[in-house]
Amino acid sequence: AQLSSLAVCVNPGSAFNCYWKMPFRKKARITLENINTAEEMRLYYQINYTLTEVPEDEAYFHAQFRRSNPTQGSLHTLIDGVKGKGQYVGTYLAWRVNDNCWWGEGEIKFYMDGDKEYPTICGTGTEDYFCGSYNFENQKTRQYQEFTTPYAGMHQVIRPDGLYRAVTAFGLYRWHI
């Protein structure tokens, strides 16, 4: 599904484009892993870079993949467990629903600067964190409504046969830039 944001674009023809600033001083490493063992990974890529001085206080870019499938009870999925200096720049969440219920009331919680008992930021629901509201539901069609903006979106909904159905899958993003 098309995704049109400032940091990442998914365009027709299987074009995946990433515009994150990724400074490096000596070397850079970009790795890809094919987790679909049923298909061979075919890849075309282009990396644009400049050899310039990197300021001493410039932050590095770090990305990681996590999976919890399925969650059980009150188990929380850790989106990012990085500790130390830095700036959290965003989340991409691929989510598949395993039952016929509303799935989005999970609070997004950020624990920063040593906070442990109470989150520094505590959201009200998954759809609110991804800048949607009221179940991402289009009130006229009574279906999920895809949207894509520069900073947040739900660009993909894979529908089996209707609203609130098991095995519906979603692609959501939120950039903090």
Annotated model-derived regions:
Residues 1-177:
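Beta-strand-centric surfaces of beta-sandwich/beta-rich domains
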